[in-house]
Amino acid sequence: MTGIALVPLAIFFVLALAFPFLPLGDRGAYLLQIGFFTLVAGIMALSWDILARSGQVSLAHAAFYGMGAYGYALLLKTGLAWPLAMPLAALGTGMISLILGAVTMRLSGMYFAIATLAFTEVVRTIIQNLPEDVAGGANGLLVPALLGGDSRGQYLLALLLLALTAGVSLAVRTGRLHHAFAAIRQGEETARVLGVSTVRYKLAAFFISSFLAALAGVLYAGKTFFISPLDTFSLANSIAPLTTSIFGGLYTTLGPILGATVLRIAEEALHNVVKNGYLVVYGLVLMLSILWLPRGLMGLLRRGRHGGDV
């Protein structure tokens, strides 16, 4: 990775930082909301991609997202301040993810994906069947507004956490984890021959990925003021990070962020134009894009420069 390769990523963050300070007019609150959820989608996609780099195609991200949201809400109910509740909810999610990682250690491919999907359903069922005075049951749970409902502040916090996620991703790509993950992805037997501790590194990938996804869940809970098992643990929250990463470009830092930005804007545009049928058109556009761009949007960028991947 070279300094040139980091330029597009730096440009993205400069533009994203300037966005909330632009004269957005009467639609300012609406545009900030779109920007906020775009950043959350970027965190989810990038956190999923970090796990995928170790060869694990997970469908448990809805569980990590939901555990972060519910963990944060329950910690706030104890009187804990949000700056403490946020990292603690993410840390708790990371610790629980290690259990999932240990249990599914011998699985791969379709069997691993099914196991992680089942884990999400188990967590959702547990949350839904907790006493209503604890987690709200199937009816959901009210959550205090993050930063008192300040839209600009919420956006900037989401941008900060996306920057943190990008920093972690870059550290993974340039450190020992990168080589270990690549070896495991090529084949665990080969990785063991090379001296890679597959168990340790796969669990590390689980912890890092789930911690970051939980932060996205915290942002969601604090922005929407309300969480429910069906919405928070929905299958869409497991599928979206996967498709976004593929669309943007796997095993890169900029790719999932770029994918989240393009898809979120496209979703809003189609919703305004096509109305009720926008999801069908959105799905077709996404499917065709993946077929025509097997290396994602990053594949297009690579054609125009030779500075390496980000």
Regions found by a protein language model. Give the residues of each.
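Cytosolic-side transmembrane-helix boundaries in multi-pass membrane proteins
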Residues: 1-17, 186-203, 269-310
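Transmembrane alpha-helical segments in multi-pass inner-membrane proteins
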Residues: 206-288, 292
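Extracellular/periplasmic helix-loop junction at the C-terminal end of a transmembrane helix
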Residues: 119-150, 157, 178, 275, ...
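Alpha-helical transmembrane segments within multi-pass membrane transporters and channels
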Residues: 79-121, 258-261
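Single transmembrane alpha-helix segments in multi-pass membrane proteins
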Residues: 28-77, 103-112, 190, 249-253
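Membrane-interfacial amphipathic/re-entrant helices at transmembrane-helix boundaries
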Residues: 1-42, 79-85, 309-310
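Helix-loop-helix "hairpin" substructures at the membrane interface of multi-pass membrane proteins
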Residues: 149-229
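Residue-level recognition of pore/gate-forming positions within transmembrane alpha-helices
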Residues: 37, 41, 69-70, 90-94, ...
